[in-house]
Design a protein with these regions (language model features):
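Conserved functional hotspots at enzyme active or ligand-binding sites that engage polyanionic ligands
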Residues: 1-104
């Protein structure tokens, strides 16, 4: 696997989890900086789901032709060993929405 970059979306194995943490293998947005991604064995991710409550901290994106929500209330650090196949990269406008929500 090459260098993981901010804004890319990967399949990530989130199990095992506890309590209300989001489960299963699902798409996740990489939110950690490229500098961190180059040197650390972990990355910061925000899971993506096609379901879920429409909260302000859950910007909408399109993934595989379907609307999906980026769960900024479920941000977590994961080891790169949890990463699966790269799905793609989000648009710059969606990335701006993510940043605005994280800073709000």
């Amino acid at each position: 696997m090459g260098v993981v970059k901010r804004g890319e979306v990967y399949w990530v194995k989130l199990d095992p989890t506890k309590g209300s943490e989001i489960r299963k293998t699902r798409p996740c947005l990489v939110i950690s900086t490229n500098d961190m991604n180059k040197v650390l064995p972990r990355i910061l991710i925000a899971p993506i789901t096609s379901k879920g409550q429409p909260l302000g901290c859950r910007p909408i994106t399109e993934l595989n032709g379907k609307n999906a929500r980026i769960l900024l209330d479920q941000i977590r650090s994961v080891d790169k060993l949890r990463l699966g196949k790269k799905i793609g990269i989000i648009s710059l406008s969606i990335w701006h929405s993510v940043l605005l929500e994280m800073l709000d």
